[in-house]
From Swiss-Prot:
A zinc finger (NR C4-type) spans 603-623, 639-663. Zn(2+) 1 binds at C603, C606, C620, C623. Residues 692-703 have a biased composition (Pro residues). This is Mineralocorticoid receptor. Progesterone binds at N770, Q776, R817, T945. The gene is NR3C2. Heteromultimeric cytoplasmic complex with HSP90, HSP70, and FKBP4, in the absence of ligand. After ligand binding, it translocates to the nucleus and binds to DNA as a homodimer and as a heterodimer with NR3C1. Binds the coactivator NCOA2. May interact with HSD11B2 in the absence of ligand. Binds the coactivators NCOA1, TIF1 and NRIP1. Residues 782-785 are annotated as: Important for coactivator binding.
């Protein structure tokens, strides 16, 4: 009883994986019929090309038994290498091997017949008669029986040949029959090592009706070359290559192999076919969806290398089908002379594309052969994720061995990536570094797309800040462009047009702040770190919007200020009502202003749902209570980690130190609540005098005849009598006081951009402080520009005053922020940069930090108000002048005197200072004098770090470079003169 071995692998699966795992050697051996048992008779199927008339089309039960006896065993050995000898054998020995091929084909037909699969015939094949073919096979079998069987080796012109046979499977009844190629044929001298794929036969059917494709065997000269090629058309050999040992079919030599039990016209079960037949062969190689046609012939002229099937003997790590002795690189078919072979890879999304390459070979030219044309057809029908990946531009590099040459090719713009490639290891795909997406790229990328990262410390004027003192105070700097778009990208990258068409500001109604305008169009918004709602605009429209001193009444307010009623009246963004009825209560107006369309808010500290604006920041109730208790209780929290704990809804109670730091960074301060209460009280006091004013006198009678006095109704007042006094009263009420103006023009808090991931070294902290000071100075200059009376001074005097007082203004503002946000416990440089005792030591300026901290403690002792702070800040701007005086000294003295009087009025108006106004005024002016001593020490340290900036690795922004460069020689020469209120 005959035993057939089957491997239970699904059809069409695991084929290409096994193709890449073919063993590196093949052992050719022939076993006698006496040594063969039924257990050794595996279903060994080979897909080879046969000479015309050499393979039978019909077979019988009796002849199949003879074929079992004649079948030699060509066994793969994956463990030990089998190197063929280089002795040239006789032609008879090669015929014996051919007989082995014929017998194995007979076994193949028996197995196919037993499987009893029905294969659909697509085209009628031109064939010989089955009886004639079978007769030829019987003659060959008898001839081989007479000569016996003995092991034979294959050699080619004294060159060792190492064949890598692929292990293909043909699924029968759910199993897989192993197929081993057993046709080593003699190489004729006229057949050079380089041969065109004209000899390669194929069993690929037409794409319309193909069910499965068998692994083909291509004849390389007279060698069988195995690769997963599926050539669409079997072509004849070139004239210079002898076809004597070839197993390739031309259309004239086509033969059909079929089952003796079925008609050749109904079921074709041969793995070899000519182009007219297009027979369907059941094989687990691939389905029509993953058929990949690979050309496997190239020459040194070709430098396009995509798929390889052959490697040299020294390259034992590459999986291939046939190697040439001298071929040391990866190629499909290598000549003994050539060192690098490749072939073009063309895989279009539509189907197959044909390219013709002229491949000259050194050997063929010596033999008198001319150029050989190789038509190569490749087809890729499966792309990555079943999607078209055109314009992908992937370079496929075949990694060579150390002793081999390297050749690579770049696929075309329409190439796809074949995800079913059998070469799982040797081929490495990398994206092109200069991919141009199928078009010619002519853009020159910028050398440094981020010009602000320059390491030079004295080239700031051209790098970071485009503002200067004269540019901000005087006319705008020509050529300044706040929009940085396109500066860091090459020309070839497509950029979206920034025409502002999505957010036309002229057509945005005031109600757009809630998210949807009256037309139903939605707008994007975001809530910033301090509760700022800002619409999405272009970069050029957003430049320094928070610095506009006097915004129009009808514009949208972008910040929720914490000073008085300004935030409650303007932050809603609704249009101003022209007429408010007297009977409408304030609660009704409040409910109207807070509509249901207001976007939901989240806590800026922990991310929980916010309950309102607490201490100047939109937070939840939990963070509100925590901040109040932490600041008023003066708790000194310490972090167990690195002061970078995650604060969210779940973990906000884990680390109170980091939670308090995040509250401070968000901008929470106790002064916001106090200023709000003061604003309400101020509004009540302003309403009482207006109610006590007597009504205007009645107008005189219209005519002298009337004895009674006629009072005109309120809706129709007399122009000459009633309207003029009312307008004068309104004009006086609408005239803003200097304190109100200073409150409105106060700059917003600036973020330092501190990176917590970097170590807290002295150079990092000082560089961060300098960058923060540069940002703050831009705001200071803009603040001084709109300061009442400051614009009346000449431009040179304005610049001089700012250069002399910039350090004093910065340190005074720092003390105020520390007093307002941290109750003078820390130094509040910025929301993201708060100095504790540890950072004061790390900054190498601990004593200076303690001096600024003492000023902040004086604010607590004096309970300084915001109105007093703003006026004292203006006096500090006017507290240092040159020794020679200013150009307009009289205007300067007048301006300074007016602000001193305003401070005196502010102290007198304060109800808490009744009877002690002069004493408080003395304390405030004494505090201003103490600022000069602190500033002298700060300037000395600043000038030292400025000189040694390169050695200390401390960065200075452009604004500070301009100010310090002009101030340093004047201060060191003694030209600066501080103005004191009290003699020392």
């Amino acid at each position: 009883m005959e035993t057939k071995g089957y491997h239970s692998l699904p059809e069409g699966l695991d084929m290409e994986r096994r193709w890449g795992q073919v063993s590196q050697t093949v052992e050719h051996s022939s076993l006698g019929s006496t040594e063969r048992t039924d257990e050794n008779n595996y279903m060994e199927i080979v897909n080879v090309s046969c000479v015309s008339g050499a393979i039978p089309n019909n077979s019988t039960q009796g002849s199949s038994k003879e074929k079992h006896e004649l079948l030699p065993c060509l066994q793969q050995d994956n463990n030990r290498p089998g190197i063929l000898t280089s002795d040239i054998k006789t032609e008879l020995e090669s015929k014996e091997l051919s007989a082995t091929v014929a017998e194995s084909m007979g076994l193949y037909m028996d197995s196919v017949r037993d499987a009893d699969y029905s294969y659909e015939q697509q085209n009628q094949q031109r064939s010989m008669s089955p009886a004639k073919i079978y007769q030829n096979v019987e003659q060959l079998v008898k001839f081989y029986k007479e000569n016996g069987h003995r092991p034979s080796t294959l050699s080619c012109v004294n060159r060792p040949l190492r064949s890598f046979m692929s292990d293909s499977g043909s699924s029968v009844n759910g199993g897989v029959m192993r197929a081993i190629v057993k046709s080593p044929i003699m190489c004729h001298e006229k057949s050079p090592s380089v041969c065109s794929p004209l000899n390669m036969t194929s069993s690929v059917c037409s794409p319309a009706g193909i069910n499965s494709v068998s692994s083909t065997t291509a004849s390389f000269g007279s060698f069988p070359v195995h690769s997963p090629i599926t050539q669409g058309t079997p072509l004849t050999c070139s004239p210079n290559v002898e076809n004597r040992g070839s197993r390739s079919h031309s259309p004239a030599h086509a033969s059909n192999v079929g089952s003796p039990l079925s008609s050749p016209l109904s079921s074709m079960k041969s793995s070899i076919s000519s182009p007219p037949s297009h027979c369907s062969v059941k094989s687990p190689v691939s389905s029509p969806n993953n058929v990949t046609l690979r050309s496997s012939v190239s020459s040194p002229a070709n430098i396009n290398n995509s798929r390889c099937s052959v490697s040299s003997p020294s390259n034992t790590n590459n999986r291939s089908t046939l190697s040439s002795p001298a071929a040391s690189t990866v190629g499909s078919i290598c000549s003994p002379v050539n060192n690098a072979f490749s072939y073009t890879a063309s895989g279009t999304s539509a189907g197959s594309s044909t390219s013709r390459d002229v491949v000259p070979s050194p050997d063929t030219q010596e033999k008198g052969a001319q150029e050989v044309l190789f038509p190569k057809t490749e087809e890729v029908e499966s792309a990555i994720s079943n999607g078209v990946t055109g314009q992908l531009n992937i370079v496929q590099y075949i990694k060579p061995e150390p002793d081999g040459a390297f050749s690579s090719s770049c696929l075309g713009g329409n190439s796809k990536i074949n995800s079913d490639s059998p070469f799982s290891v040797p081929i490495k795909q990398e994206s092109t570094k200069h991919s141009c997406s199928g078009t010619s790229f002519k853009g020159n990328p910028t050398v440094n797309p981020f010009p602000f990262m320059d390491g030079s410390y004295f080239s700031f004027m051209d790098d970071k800040d485009y503002y200067s003192l004269s540019g901000i105070l005087g006319p705008p700097v020509p050529g300044f462009d706040g929009n940085c778009e396109g500066s860091g990208f090459p020309v070839g990258i497509k950029q979206e047009p920034d025409d502002g068409s999505y957010y036309p500001e002229a057509s945005i109604p005031s109600s757009a702040i809630v998210g949807v305008n009256s037309g139903g169009q939605s707008f994007h918004y975001r809530i910033g770190a301090q509760g700022t709602i800002s619409l999405s605009r272009s970069a050029r429209d957003q430049s320094f919007q928070h610095l506009s001193s006097f915004p129009p009444v009808n514009t949208l307010v972008e910040s929720w200020k914490s000073h008085g009623d300004l935030s409650s009246r303007r932050s809603d963004g609704y249009p101003v009502l022209e007429y408010i009825p007297e009977n409408v209560s304030s609660s009704t107006l409040r409910s109207v202003s807070t509509g249901s369309s207001r976007p939901s808010k989240i806590c800026l500290v922990c991310g929980d749902e916010a309950s309102g604006c607490h201490y100047g920041v939109v937070t939840c109730g939990s963070c509100k209570v925590f901040f109040k208790r932490a600041v008023e209780g003066q708790h000194n929290y310490l972090c167990a980690g690195r002061n970078d704990c995650i604060i969210d809804k779940i973990r906000r109670k884990n680390c109170p130190a980091c939670r308090l730091q995040k509250c401070l960074q968000a901008g929470m301060n106790l002064g916001a609540r106090k200023s709000k209460k003061l604003g309400k009280l101020k509004g009540i006091h302003e309403e009482q005098p207006q109610q006590q004013q007597p009504p205007p006198p009645p107008p005189p009678p219209q005519s002298p005849e009337e004895g009674t006095t006629y009072i005109a109704p309120a809706k129709e007042p007399s122009v000459n009598t009633a309207l003029v006094p009312q307008l004068s009263t309104i004009s006086r009420a609408l005239t803003p006081s200097p304190a109100m103006i200073l409150e409105n023009i106060e700059p917003e808090v600036v973020y330092a951009g501190y990176d917590n991931s970097k170590p807290d070294t002295a150079e990092n902290l000082l560089s961060t402080l300098n960058r923060l000071a540069g940002k703050q100075m831009i705001q200071v200059v803009k603040w001084a520009k709109v300061l009442p009376g400051f614009k009346n001074l000449p431009l040179e005097d304005q610049i001089t005053l700012i250069q002399y007082s910039w350090m004093c203004l910065s340190s005074f503002a720092l003390s105020w922020r520390s007093y307002k946000h941290t109750n003078s416990q820390f130094l509040y440089f910025a929301p993201d940069l708060v100095f504790n005792e540890e950072k004061m030591h790390q900054s190498a300026m601990y004593e200076l930090c303690q001096g600024m901290h003492q000023i902040s403690l004086q604010f607590i002792r004096l309970q300084l108000t915001f109105e007093e702070y703003t006026i004292m800040k203006v006096l500090l701007l006017l507290s240092t002048v040159p020794k020679d005086g200013l150009k307009s000294q009289a205007a300067f003295e007048e301006m300074r005197t007016n602000y001193i009087k305003e401070l005196r009025k502010m102290v007198t108006k304060c109800p808490n200072n009744s009877g002690q106004s002069w004493q408080r005024f003395y304390q405030l002016t004494k505090l201003l004098d103490s600022m000069h001593d602190l500033v002298n020490d700060l300037l000395e340290f600043c000038f030292y770090t400025f000189r040694e900036s390169q050695a200390l690795k401390v960065e200075f922004p452009a604004m500070l470079v301009e100010i310090i460069s002009d101030q340093l020689p004047k201060v060191e020469s003694g030209n600066a003169k501080p103005l004191y209120f009290h003699r020392k």
